[in-house]
Amino acid sequence: MDSPEVTFTLAYLVFAVCFVFTPTEFHSAGLTVQNLLSGWLGSEDAAFVPYHLRRTAATLLCHSLLPLGYYVGMCFAASEKQLYYPSQTPETWRAFLLLALMLPAIACTLIYYWSRDHWACHPLARTLALYALPRSGWQAVASSVNTEFRRIDKFATGVPGARVIVTDTWVMKVTTYRVHVAQQQDVRLTVTEAQQHELSPDSHLPVQLLTIRVASANPAVPAFHIRLNSTEYGELCEKLRAPIRSAANVVIHQSLGDLFLETFASLVEVNPAYSVPSSQDLEACIGCMQTQASVKLVKTCQEVAVGECQQCYCRPMWCLTCMGKWFASRQDPQRPDTWLASRVPCPTCRARFCVLDVCAVR
């Protein structure tokens, strides 16, 4: 392929990926289906269910048009190929054009099926119909969902492509093409996985993401998974009526302090160990009085300057957890990105030390 063809292909590929997965920059620029078709979609706050009935249909149609958009663009980017005359184009391009035309045709057929009988065939409407009373329809359930979504006390989190919403009665997950709904009174929630991510856009501390399986007692309601930050776990539990079970070996860090303690411990493990003289016996930690003292402060930096680390002459008196809690308690809660690089006074002699000075006792 020549240069204009390559340039357009790469540019369109980037645009298509960003249009489907919508990063923050595209949201800020308004290049989303929700923003471009806001006049037809209406307001999510005013009518949650009708909004998402139309949004999922519009999203499916817009995304199905992307291959056709690429073909039309290539008609101008590679005009020498005469792609605007399908009968004269190579077999490969004719096959691509056929696929590009079939996708929106299939999408339109599916959307037409969904919209029959006032959207009664839409997957969201069919799920809501499972919770309808014998003499009422899914619209009555949708009205209840709309009312609860308008309340300010709902729990809402997640990125636009995977939002989690919990109201007084409903647990919902809003994705690009679908809205999962389950009623709180008959769901079983299980934390199936806890993933630790070392990089955070807001701080140098790790982020723990929890995966929770939401399964309804009604077998006709498909189960789904929600993901959220572990720091939001407590708020989620307050909104839920049903308890959340945890799978074996899943440890949940519900606060920033929990995440810091884990990072603090991992850094101490790579520091040089401190060998206790044979004549010295280790006593119980003076912080918790429950475990044996396990760390010693040993100055590692060589330069002596104002505000830098100082030598601590205290014997091992603290366990790793208590020392980590002391270190965290001396930090600015609004600046977690500075915690690991800061220096704090020894809890006993007040000599200043950093994380690199905390050595495990051997």
Curated annotation (Swiss-Prot):
EC number of the protein? 2.3.2.27
What's a GO cellular component annotated to this UniProt protein?
Answer: endoplasmic reticulum membrane
Q: List the RING-type zinc finger ranges.
A: 285-350
GO biological process annotations for this chain's record? protein ubiquitination; response to unfolded protein
Protein's membrane topology:
Multi-pass membrane protein
Q: In which pathway does it act?
A: Protein modification; protein ubiquitination
Q: What main location does UniProt list?
A: endoplasmic reticulum
Which Pfam families would you find in this protein's record? Answer: Tmpp129 (PF10272)
> Which residue spans belong to the Cytoplasmic compartment?
28-56, 116-362
The UniProt keyword set, sorted, is:
Endoplasmic reticulum, Membrane, Metal-binding, Transferase, Transmembrane, Transmembrane helix, Ubl conjugation pathway, Unfolded protein response, Zinc, Zinc-finger
Q: Which GO terms describe its molecular function?
A: ubiquitin protein ligase activity; zinc ion binding
Q: Which reaction does it catalyse?
A: S-ubiquitinyl-[E2 ubiquitin-conjugating enzyme]-L-cysteine + [acceptor protein]-L-lysine = [E2 ubiquitin-conjugating enzyme]-L-cysteine + N(6)-ubiquitinyl-[acceptor protein]-L-lysine
Q: Which domain of life is it from?
A: Eukaryota
Q: Which residues cross the membrane?
A: 7-27, 57-77, 95-115
* Class in the EC hierarchy, top level: transferase
Q: Which residues lie on this side of the membrane: Lumenal?
A: 1-6, 78-94
User: Can you say where in the cell this protein is located?
Assistant: Endoplasmic reticulum membrane
How this chain assembles, per its entry, is: Integral component of ER-resident dislocation complexes.
Q: State the function annotated in the UniProt record.
A: E3 ubiquitin-protein ligase involved in ER-associated protein degradation, preferentially associates with the E2 enzyme UBE2J2. Exploited by viral US11 proteins to mediate HLA class I proteins degradation.
**Domains as described in the record:** The RING-type zinc finger domain is responsible for E3 ubiquitin ligase activity.
Q: Which family does the UniProt entry place this protein in? A: Belongs to the TMEM129 family.
For this entry, the protein name equals E3 ubiquitin-protein ligase TM129
- The record lists the organism as Bos taurus
